Swiss-Prot record:
Lineage: Eukaryota, Metazoa, Chordata, Craniata, Vertebrata
Name of the protein in question: Rho guanine nucleotide exchange factor TIAM2
Keyword Phosphoprotein carried by entry: yes
Pfam family, one: RhoGEF
Biased segments, Low complexity type: 238-248, 1513-1527
Organism, scientific name: Homo sapiens
All residue ranges annotated as the DH domain in the record: 1099-1293
Modified residues (Phosphothreonine): T1648
Length: 1701
């Protein structure tokens, strides 16, 4: 009927019933919905009978994108609902049957009497054949017949069509067929009969004659002159749709007279019979038409002979059964090939017609309304072309698996089949004897699929929707010979394979494009950026609305040598140019209705614009087809107008709701209103998005500018902006994806795409489909499509007459290990265990003896994972499904003398007679006998002591388990975790069960157990297929050991298949190489570093060895960093000195320190000669003390890393320069020619950050493996605390830098003078920070002066004072942009001040009349050169202790600066560059186990004595790991092994030259004391500190390099008891040790100090033949000019016994 706007399109109803003599005539009523007053109607819907009622396949899979792969019949139940269906198209071209003419006739249904044009066609003398059944013809005969079989006199009148409206408001009508020759004979009573409402049920009441439909076989007397002219409205192109139409009218093969119809076989050749319906015989000849003695039992037999054309009409009959069932209204449908139908024309009586009705929503009769008849008929006469029709050899591509009828768009079926030899080929015929529905059929011939005439009619989409919406009442019987809707029977990838093999749609655009996914929809409809994917180049063709990606170039789709790599469905897409892309030009972004966003890069700007136009035009064409419109432009304009109205309405409603919300106080009502407002916001966003999309489509069709996206983005609601802000992309494309992610229909499509991917690769998006034929490894193992079809023939038939619901079903091939397999249909409700059971039953196997695993191809590796039995199969991601036999193995458990139980528990499943059916291992003790023999949780016991489990009852089982020895036969159940079993193993069997000589060695057996333990554990979920379990639980505990290695080896021999054992060995090798670099997170129970069956000694040994090995690797990496990058960069000019500082900073010191630390660790291990043979943890005691002592000794030194870590932000900035600086980039490329990421500068610079945070993890491992009551456990715990404090200190430094780094950089940049004294402030040089009150604030601060608090930062080079306004509303400066600018309102730092150390003084200041001991003064000295007056800051700490700490720290840097000026006048930066941090010491004495003193210190020291407290000024030299005098003493010296002349460490101890300073510095010498608690003592007359001060003044500084000490020295004041009187104590370096002395350790009396002075004088007067200048050593190593200055350092001397211990 050609209603281009109607929701149903009639292509011509078919006669589906047999002629029965004397049948009562029932008028045919066709009820057609959706006819509106202003809609234009097209004749195209009235197809001629050859294939007028062809159904589309229920093609939800392979052929779903091509409408006409196969047409199958449908017969439905009564009273079903009507579903909206897209318009079907058929072209009504008619023939005459005048004597002497070659035309068979023209349907009177389309005669000029009824207002229709008729078109005659002159055909050549050849057979136009059809090899594709349209599925809607009831002339079930498959032979060609000569034209002579129909005498000229047998022509008859065509039926007359009467159109009657059914209901005034319904818009529906009824079409009644009557004898076309006598319109006046239409019985009046027929018009009043109730309309029979069926779902396309060709009904035949008893004694009813079928109706001859508008078929090519219907004879008529119409003349060829009735053909329309080429300018007929039927042949016009649609108005205004030239851009969106895929081909105009002159492309179509149904053009002027003399051309063939686009659908081959639409017209019969002169030598062909009239394939009129067999129901069309006059009553007079009713006894002959079907030769009722039919011998055929089903129509399938008609197609078994390829030469059916030779049969006589009398030899072809419908079975009596068929006729009977039709007579009883059993709703059968059958069909035959279009052309293999003999004419059944007879003379005489008028033809009677049956009544047909279309489905409607209200199954009741409607009162006729004839008022609209004329207007409807007039509308039906209007014939116009359809926008987007395809050329004759093309076929439209349709989105697959769309579930809504309205989503299926239609296009004309084109393509002429000129294969003359194909006339005898018939489609694989589907016949059902008692079905209400027939599944789709498809041609066996591949060529037939591609080029057969394919039609559709108004029922197609309706029936498809019925298929999808049906829930029960499915009682179809399907022939085993059918392919059973092969379009659904293949996996999704195979569907796409076939689809793109057969697809011949119009290519709108093709070209090279770079492609990269950007955004996709993850779980819970959340948009996420795609994991970093590289740009890839493809040859992209736009076919219809699908982008096909090829890896090679072809001139057109027919020339493509390979199948497309993937396909991207671009339905309802928006394409936007991305000029702001930072790296590439000509980039555009495509977002589709699935919520996916993709980036493309075109070759030029013109190419980009062409792609945008092409995609938008294709989407517009598809949009028009889905809405059944022929005028795309008008449709889009109407849609735009409607959307504007909707936006206006919803905006008003939303405003009203907001007003209402402002006055409503009830919480429930407010919640409801808020939800409604949110819904309106989302609706508005969707409307705005659709409006923008329509305008984009209009712009592409009209050649205009694309709309401005500002108005669209302005419509985004606050939640949407927040979501896009989290995503990091605010653009039209991301907004479109967000809106689409909320759409339920798009989500359903996406879910279908995701769940029906079958063996798709992981990571391919729902709308981006990969194809099976590409990059498929092991393709020879995959069944071909034809093999899958054959399997479907075998296994695809439904059981018990109930069909599968193929709409959501995936046909998947399941592999078995014998290289065979089966195809099973996976439904959404199928779990893993269901698929396993189904596959095993198809192979007659016992499912309980098999497991299911998924094979995935990741890069070049094959990964296996075993899903849990209860998980849904369609939710898995895999390439192949494999069923593998579970491993059966025997275990003999025997209790020895000390073992009282086996160490496992069982769960039994029993029947009602208390007989066992199954026994499972429910628990296994990790260190029990059963575990050692290979029993694992979840294994199933098959036999007990040779007795089958099924033959036992509970009592017998308990009796057997109570015996001393029990023999078990077990099945190893697969794990329920989806952990990857292995990667990239070979298929060769390295270990075979019958090759005992190839068993892995015992240590590999243990390692295999470790891995098997990880993935052989099961939870109760494994037994989800055991619903009712009565438990006979036997739980026991044991302390047995693994002493039966032979049994274990036997178990390993049979425990895993060869492939898995190979993989496990390889996996272990990988894990060994990786070591402990990452904590294991996937293990359950909680992670431990090694498997439980290893002894504690083995685990300790492994962790210690790993600590040393990784330390070696780390030191090697740092060395490579210096050799590859640091040293060569110093000779280059493209990095400034500041940038070099940022990049490398304290790395030289760090490297030297790490070398020393590594040597310390190695010394500790080498001291334990039996390290590899220790058997118990207690034997590791000495070694663990050594390791713990090393960490304690160097804990503060690790704070070197704080500066480096804080500077890592700068590192990123410097490395960014490589993108713009070609010279820098060339340098980096030259350093890393192999392009390995591990060798890049960025990779090397991150290693220190990773390493320093790794130490606490390793120490935690050691702590967990020691006895909690042991001394080494306490010792390691203290070391762990120390390293955790280091980590927290590093984090604190980073936080300070983030908060105040802006200020530090600004102050450095704002320094006055030609040469800046402070070029950089590194966080590694931050010694202390504290908050103080400012007692004399500047007047310029105004109101802020009251109670003003400053933060004091003490660096090695300067002191900084900062006042930060505590206002949360003010934003601080971003740390990544730090320009020098004046203080503004946005700047929270209202005051900042930098005092270089050269202009710094500090003094204690108590204002007169105050008793506050917490006040002190910081002085910025005046400078005449810079014209700077003296500035005094009066500061007050919170308590005297805080004051003491900060003043100590400032004094220490002043001493450091003084020494530097005295020695060489070198600036600090130069000395820092030349200084290498630690002396290469041997093992610290504190780490020596036998030292009674160190043990005593360890036992008596509290935890906070191991490391200095950060906030109290104890981190004086964090850049060098040392602590200056007065903050941290050196409690643990090291035995001096050898001196390294390069190792210097200035600035550690009090400078004796301080005595020469002004009195105001000396008088406060209590501050300089080494006592940590000296700050508690005030300056009093006669105090011990005063005595020390006097002695300092008397000390002489020895600068004579020729004075050498003798070997015989006086013992130091702290010499040990066992030291000989004349023996020189060993000089050790102890200033790194964080273990503090006791508070009274340096409170000397006057006699002690005098003795020290005498001893110092004796040192200076030693003979000159000594080889060591002790003073020079002290000066070089400890930055002190005389030994006298360190007489109070008790730990500098120790007994020889300590050194040897």
């Amino acid at each position: 009927m050609g209603n281009s706007d109607s929701q149903y399109t009639l292509q011509g109803s078919k006669n589906h019933s047999n002629t029965i003599t004397g049948a009562k005539q029932i008028p045919c009523s066709l009820k057609i919905r959706g006819i509106h007053a202003k809609e234009e109607k097209s004749l195209h819907g009235w197809g001629h009978g050859s294939n007028g009622a062809g159904y589309k396949s229920r093609s939800l899979a392979r052929s779903c994108l091509s409408h006409f792969k196969s047409n199958q019949p449908y017969a439905s139940r009564l009273g079903g609902p009507t579903c909206k269906v897209s318009r079907g198209v058929a072209y009504s071209t008619h023939r005459t049957n005048a004597p002497g003419k070659d035309f068979q006739g023209i349907s009177a249904a389309f005669s000029t009497e009824n207002g229709f044009h008729s078109v005659g066609h002159e055909l050549a003398d050849n057979h136009i054949t059809s090899r594709d059944c349209n599925g809607h013809l009831l002339n079930c005969y498959g032979r060609n017949e000569s034209i002579a079989s129909t005498p000229p006199g047998e022509d008859r009148k065509s039926p007359r069509v009467l159109i009657k409206t059914l209901g005034k408001l319904d818009g529906c009508l009824r079409v009644e067929f009557h004898n076309g020759g006598n319109p006046s004979k239409v019985p009046a009573e027929d018009c009043s009969e109730p309309v029979q409402l069926l779902r396309y049920s060709p009904t035949l009441a008893s004694e009813t004659s079928p109706v001859p439909e508008a078929r090519r076989g219907s004879s008529a007397d119409s003349l060829p002159s009735h053909r329309p002219s080429p300018t007929d409205s039927r042949l016009r192109s649609s108005k205004g749709s030239s851009l969106s139409s895929e081909s105009s009218w002159y492309d179509s093969p149904w053009g002027n007279a003399g051309e063939l119809s686009e659908a081959e076989g639409s017209f019969l050749a002169p030598g062909m019979p009239d394939p009129s319906l067999h129901a069309s015989f006059p009553p007079g000849d009713a006894k002959k038409p079907f030769n009722q003695s039919s011998s055929l039992s089903s129509l399938r037999e008609l197609y078994k002979d390829a030469n059916l054309g030779s049969l006589s009409p009398s030899g072809i009959r419908l079975s009596d059964e068929y006729m009977g069932t039709h007579a009883s209204l059993s709703n059968r449908v059958s069909f035959a090939s279009d052309i293999d139908v003999p004419s059944r024309v007879a003379h005489g009586d008028p033809i009677q017609y049956s009544s047909f009705t279309l489905p409607c929503r209200k199954p009741k009769a409607f009162v006729e309304d004839t008022a609209k008849k004329d207007s409807l008929k007039a509308r039906m006469r209007r014939i116009s072309d359809w926008t987007g029709s395809l050329s004759r050899k093309k076929r439209k591509l349709q989105e697959p698996r769309s579930k809504e009828g309205s989503d299926y768009f239609d296009s004309r079926s084109d393509g002429l089949n000129t294969d003359v030899q194909g006339s005898s080929q018939a489609s694989a015929f589907l016949w059902s004897g008692g079905s209400t529905q027939i599944l789709s059929q498809r041609s066996e011939s591949t060529h037939a699929i591609g080029s057969d005439p394919l039609r559709q009619n108004i029922y197609e989409n309706f029936m498809r929707e019925l298929e999808m919406s049906r829930t029960n009442t499915e009682n179809i019987e399907t022939s085993t010979e059918t392919a059973e809707s092969s379009s659904e029977s293949l996996s999704s990838l195979e569907q796409l394979d076939l689809l793109f093999e057969k697809e011949q749609g119009v290519v709108r655009k093709a070209g090279w494009l770079f492609f990269k996914p950007l955004v996709t929809v993850q779980k819970e409809r959340k948009l996420e950026l795609v994991a970093r994917r590289k740009w890839k180049q493809y040859w992209v063709t736009l076919k219809g609305c699908t982008l096909l990606f090829y890896e090679t170039y072809g001139k057109n789709s027919m020339d493509q040598s390979s199948a497309p790599r993937c396909a991207l469905f671009a339905e309802d897409s928006i394409v936007q140019s991305v000029p702001e892309h930072p790296k590439k030009e000509n980039v555009f972004c495509l977002s589709n209705s699935f919520g996916d966003v993709y980036l493309f890069q075109a070759t030029s700007q013109t190419d980009l614009e062409n792609w945008v136009t092409a995609v938008h035009s294709a989407c517009a064409s598809l949009f028009a087809k889905k809405h059944g419109k022929e005028d795309t432009l008008r449709l889009l304009k109407n849609q735009t107008k409607n959307l504007l109205q909707k936006i206006d309405m919803d905006s008003k409603m939303k405003k009203m709701a907001e007003l209402q919300l402002s006055v409503v106080s009830d919480p429930k009502n407010r919640k409801a209103i808020e939800n409604q407002i949110q819904q309106w916001e989302q609706n508005l966003e969707k409307f705005h998005m659709d409006l923008f999309r329509m305008r984009c489509y209009l712009a592409s069709l009209q050649g205009g500018e694309l709309p401005n996206p500002k108005s669209l983005l302005a419509a985004a609601s606050r939640p949407s902006k927040l979501a896009l802000g989290r995503l990091g992309i605010l653009s039209v494309s991301s907004f479109h994806a967000l809106v689409c992610s909320r759409d339920d229909s798009a989500l359903r499509k996406r879910t279908l795409s995701l769940t029906q991917r079958g063996r798709n690769k992981k990571g391919i998006f729902s709308s981006l489909k990969g194809l099976d034929t590409l990059a498929r490894k092991g393709k020879e193992k995959r069944p071909s499509i034809t093999q899958v079809d054959e399997l479907l023939h075998i296994y695809g038939s439904t059981v018990d007459g109930v069909p599968r619901d193929n709409a959501w079903e995936i046909q998947t091939y399941v592999h078995f290990q014998d290289n065979h397999g089966v195809t099973v249909g996976i439904k959404p409700e199928h779990r893993v265990e269901d698929i396993l059971t189904l596959a095993c039953k198809m192979r007659q196997l016992e499912p309980s003896h098999y497991g299911l695993q998924l094979r995935k191809l990741v890069d070049d590796n094959v990964e296996y994972c075993i899903p849990a039995p209860y998980e849904y199969m369609q939710q898995q991601v895999y390439d192949e499904i494999e069923v593998f036999p579970l491993n059966v193995y025997d275990v003999q458990l025997t209790k020895t003398g000390s073992v009282c139980d086996f160490g496992f528990a069982v769960t039994a499943q029993v029947d009602e007679r208390q007989h066992l059916s199954r026994i499972f291992i429910s628990d296994v003790l990790p260190d029990g006998l059963a575990y050692g023999e290979g029993l694992r949780k979840g294994n199933e016991i098959m036999t007990l002591n040779g007795e089958a489990v099924s033959d036992l009852d509970l009592k017998q089982m308990e009796a057997l388990f109570s015996e001393k020895s029990v023999g078990l036969t077990l099945i190893a159940r697969p794990p329920d975790t989806k952990a990857t079993l292995c990667t990239s193993w070979s298929d060769s069997d390295l270990f075979s069960r019958d090759q005992k000589s190839l068993l892995p060695p015992p240590n590999q057996s243990q390692l295999l157990e470790e891995f098997l333990d990880n993935f052989k554990k099961n939870t109760a979920n494994d037994f989800s297929n055991v619903p009712d379990i009565t438990t006979g639980l036997k739980r026991s505990q044991t302390d047995g050991t693994l002493d039966q290695v032979s049994h274990r080896e036997k178990m390993e021999q049979t425990f895993r298949s060869a492939e898995q054992i190979t993989a496990l060995c390889r996996s272990f090798n990988d894990s060994q190489a990786n070591g402990m670099e990452g904590p294991r997170e996937n293990q359950d129970p909680p992670p431990r570093s090694l498997a439980r069956h290893l002894s504690d000694a083995d685990r300790l040994r492994k962790v210690i060895q790993e600590l040393v090995d990784t330390e070696k690797s780390y030191v090697k990496d740092l060395s490579c960093l210096f050799e590859l990058y640091l040293e060569p960069l110093q000779n280059e000019t493209f990095l400034t000195q500041d940038e070099m500082e940022s990049l490398f900073g304290s790395l030289p010191e760090m490297l030297e320190f790490q070398k020393v630390f590594l040597e310390t660790l190695e010394d500790g291990i080498s001291a334990s000669s039996d390290f590899n043979t220790l058997e118990t943890p207690s034997q590791f005691r000495k070694l663990l003390f050594s390791l713990g002592g090393s960490f304690l000794y160097y804990a503060d030194h690790f704070k070197l890393y704080s500066g480096f870590c804080a500077n890592h932000i700068k590192v990123q900035k410097v490395l960014e320069r490589a993108k713009t600086d070609k010279a820098f980039k060339a340098f980096l490329d030259a350093r890393n020619p192999t392009k390995q990421h591990s060798s890049t500068l960025e990779s090397y610079l991150i290693k220190p950050v990773q390493r320093v945070l790794k130490y606490p993890l390793l120490l935690k491992e050691l702590v967990s493996l020691t006895d909690q009551e042991s001394e080494e456990h306490y010792h390691l715990t203290e070391a762990l605390k120390a390293m955790e404090k280091v980590a927290s200190h590093i984090n604190e430094m980073q936080k300070i830098y983030e908060d105040y780094g802006t200020v530090f950089d600004q102050l450095v940049a704002e320094q006055s003078g030609t040469e800046k004294e402070v070029t950089e402030l590194s966080m590694g040089e931050l010694l202390m920070h504290s908050t103080v009150s400012w007692l004399n604030p500047f007047l310029s601060l105004g109101k802020a002066r009251k109670d003003l608090e400053l933060t004091v930062f003490v660096f090695k080079r300067a002191v900084i004072l900062v006042y930060k306004e505590n206002c949360k509303l003010k934003k601080k400066l971003p740390s990544n942009s730090r320009p020098a600018h004046n203080s503004t309102d946005l700047d929270p730092f209202k005051f900042r001040w930098l005092i270089p150390i050269s202009a710094l003084q500090v003094r204690l200041g108590n204002p007169a009349g105050t008793e506050n001991n917490s006040i002190w003064e910081l002085i910025h000295t005046k400078s005449e050169i810079e014209g700077r007056p003296e500035t005094i800051f009066q500061l007050c700490c919170s308590d005297s202790e805080s004051k003491t700490n900060i003043v100590k720290v400032i004094r220490s840097i002043l001493r450091e600066n003084f020494r530097r000026h005295i020695k060489c006048e070198l600036p600090l930066e130069k000395t820092c560059k030349d200084r290498l941090v630690p002396l290469k010491n041997r093992v610290p004495v504190s780490a020596k186990l036998a030292s009674s003193r160190s043990l005593k210190v360890l036992k008596n020291s509290s935890s906070n004595e191991w490391t200095g407290e950060t906030g109290k000024g104890t981190l004086l030299d964090s850049d060098e790991g040392s602590l200056s005098s007065g903050t941290q003493s050196s409690g643990c010296p090291t035995a001096e092994g050898r001196q390294d002349s390069k190792s210097t460490s200035p600035g550690k101890y009090p400078h004796p030259g301080l005595a020469d300073f002004a009195d105001n510095l000396i008088k406060e010498s209590d501050i300089l004391s080494d006592e940590d608690d000296d700050h508690r003592q005030t300056v009093k007359q006669g105090s011990p500190t005063k005595d020390i001060e006097i002695q300092f003044q008397r000390l002489r500084i020895s600068e004579d390099p020729d004075v050498h000490p003798e070997a015989e020295q006086q013992p130091g004041p702290e010499s040990g008891e066992g030291q000989k009187g004349g023996e020189q104590p060993k000089l050790v370096r102890g200033h790194f040790c964080p273990i503090k002395r006791k508070a009274n350790s340096t409170k000397r009396d006057r006699g002690t100090l005098l003795k020290a002075q005498i001893r110092h004088q004796s040192l200076d007067s030693q003979s000159e033949n000594a080889t060591i200048d002790l003073n020079s050593v002290l000066e070089r190593e400890f930055s002190v000019q005389s030994l006298t200055s360190v007489v109070s350092e008790e730990c500098f001397y120790e007994t020889e016994s300590h050194g040897k211990s």
